[in-house]
C-alpha cells in the first residue's frame, strides 16, 4: 500500500448491512457504508475526506486510496476476501520476546532526534502496541514477530502506518518507521519506567494569561467567542484540533461523553478546528461529520488553516507544538494550563494517567 517497494497490510470487515470496520488490534474503527458506484466498490473514509475505490474481480479487489474530491490519488490498494491474518506467519520459526515498555529515540532523515516510548504486547507471534511521542501516539498497531524481527501496521483511513524492527542480542531493539512521507530510524532499550516529559509543562510558564480575543464561526454560521455570556464564570476547555488528526479522534471520543456527564458542574468546551482547507463549505462539511460521529454537544468553531502560524496568531499563543493541544481556561478567562499532545487509549497506563490528570485539573479549577 506504500507503492512498489513496500506493501502495508491491513484488515477490514464488511457486515451484512454494508457497514465497514477497519481492524487494528482491539479496535474496530467504523467507517461509512459501502457505496456501489458504476462498476466500482467505494468505501467512504469520511473522517479524513478520503475513500477507497475498488474494482471487484471474483474474491479480490484492486483500486486506490484517494481524496473524495478526486484531487489526488494517495496510494494503490489491493484486497483479498477471507484473509483474516495481517502478516503471514512462517512455519518452524520461533518468536523472540519483544513485549515490554521501551525508551525509544527516533532519528529523522534530517538528522533531528526525538524521544519516544514504545508499549508492546505479545501473545506468541502476535504483536500489538503503540509508540508515544510528545505530539501524540501512533494509535493501535498490530503485527507479528518472526524470529528476532517484528512488523507492525495500522490503517484507519488516512495514510497507513508501518514499523519494522528487530531484537538485538543485548535486548535492545532497532528499526524503521516508514510512511508515504516519512522514513525514520529508531533504537530503544527496555525500561518499565520510561515516560515522556510532562505534557502540561511543554507550553506552560506558570503565569496565567488571557488568550487573544477570538470570534469564530460554528457549524451553523453563528459567531462564537470566549466572551459570550454562555462562558462567563465557567471553566472552559478549549481543544485545538482538526478532523484530519488521528489523535484528535481519540480526544473527541473521550471529551464528548465526558461533557455530557460534567456540563452541569459549570464547565464548557469550545473546540477550535484548524483544517486542511480554508474553504468554509469544506470546513463545515468535515466538522459536521466529526460532530455527528462523536455526538458532540458543545461548540465547534473554525479557526482557519491547519498550521502553527495560524494557531499562534488567532489565539495569541507564543508557541504551538502539536494537534491536539488542550487549553484549560479558569473562571476569570485566563489560561491556567496547556496540555500539549495526546496519549490515547492504545497507550494503556499512560492514558489512565492522562484521564486522572485531566479530571484533577478540572476539579481544581471548579473549586477556585
Question: Positions of the model-derived regions?
Answer:
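N-terminal "domain-start" segment that seeds a small globular fold
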Residues: 191-228
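Surface-exposed beta-loop interaction hotspot
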Residues: 73-106, 199-205, 211-214
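Thiol-/selenol-based redox modules, centered on thioredoxin-like
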Residues: 322-368
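Thiol-based oxidoreductase modules, predominantly thioredoxin-like and allied folds used
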Residues: 266-283, 295-307
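Conserved redox-active cysteine motifs that mediate thiol-disulfide chemistry
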Residues: 239-257, 261, 278-279
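Central antiparallel beta-sheet cores of small beta-barrel/beta-sandwich binding domains
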Residues: 2-56, 88, 96-168
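Short, internal strand/loop/helix patches
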Residues: 287-325
Amino acid at each position: 500500500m506504500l507503492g512498489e517497494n513496500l506493501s502495508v497490510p491491513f484488515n477490514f470487515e464488511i457486515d451484512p448491512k454494508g457497514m465497514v470496520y477497519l481492524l487494528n488490534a482491539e479496535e474496530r474503527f467504523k467507517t461509512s457504508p459501502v457505496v456501489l458506484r458504476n462498476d466500482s466498490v467505494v468505501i467512504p473514509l469520511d473522517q479524513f475526506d478520503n475513500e477507497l475505490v475498488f474494482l471487484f474481480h471474483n474474491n479480490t479487489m484492486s483500486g486506490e486510496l484517494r481524496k473524495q474530491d478526486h484531487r489526488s490519488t494517495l496510494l494503490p490498494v489491493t484486497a483479498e476476501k477471507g484473509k483474516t491474518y495481517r502478516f503471514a506467519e512462517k512455519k518452524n520459526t520461533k518468536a523472540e520476546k519483544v513485549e515490554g515498555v521501551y525508551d525509544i529515540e527516533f532519528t529523522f532523515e534530517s538528522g533531528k532526534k526525538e524521544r519516544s516510548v514504545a508499549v508492546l504486547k505479545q501473545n506468541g507471534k502476535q504483536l500489538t502496541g503503540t509508540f508515544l511521542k510528545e505530539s501524540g501516539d501512533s494509535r493501535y498497531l498490530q503485527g507479528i514477530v518472526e524470529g528476532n524481527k517484528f512488523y507492525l501496521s495500522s490503517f484507519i483511513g488516512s495514510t497507513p502506518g508501518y514499523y519494522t524492527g528487530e531484537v538485538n542480542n543485548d535486548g535492545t531493539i532497532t528499526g524503521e518507521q516508514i510512511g508515504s512521507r516519512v522514513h525514520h530510524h529508531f533504537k530503544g532499550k527496555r525500561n518499565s519506567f520510561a515516560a515522556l516529559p510532562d505534557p502540561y509543562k511543554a507550553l506552560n510558564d506558570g503565569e496565567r494569561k488571557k488568550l487573544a480575543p477570538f470570534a469564530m464561526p460554528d457549524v451553523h454560521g453563528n459567531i462564537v467567542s470566549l466572551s459570550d455570556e454562555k462562558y462567563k464564570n465557567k471553566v472552559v476547555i478549549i481543544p485545538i484540533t482538526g478532523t484530519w488528526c488521528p489523535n484528535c479522534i481519540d480526544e473527541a471520543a473521550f471529551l464528548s461523553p465526558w461533557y455530557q456527564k460534567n456540563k452541569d458542574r459549570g464547565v464548557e468546551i469550545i473546540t477550535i478546528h484548524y483544517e486542511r482547507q480554508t474553504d468554509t463549505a469544506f470546513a463545515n462539511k468535515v466538522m459536521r461529520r466529526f460532530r455527528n460521529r462523536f455526538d458532540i454537544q458543545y461548540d465547534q468553531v473554525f479557526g482557519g488553516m491547519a498550521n502553527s502560524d495560524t494557531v499562534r496568531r488567532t489565539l495569541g499563543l507564543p508557541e504551538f507544538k502539536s494537534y491536539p493541544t488542550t487549553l484549560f481556561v479558569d473562571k476569570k478567562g485566563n489560561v491556567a494550563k496547556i496540555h500539549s499532545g495526546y496519549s490515547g487509549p492504545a497507550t494503556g497506563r499512560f492514558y489512565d494517567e492522562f484521564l486522572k490528570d485531566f479530571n484533577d485539573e478540572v476539579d481544581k479549577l471548579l473549586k477556585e
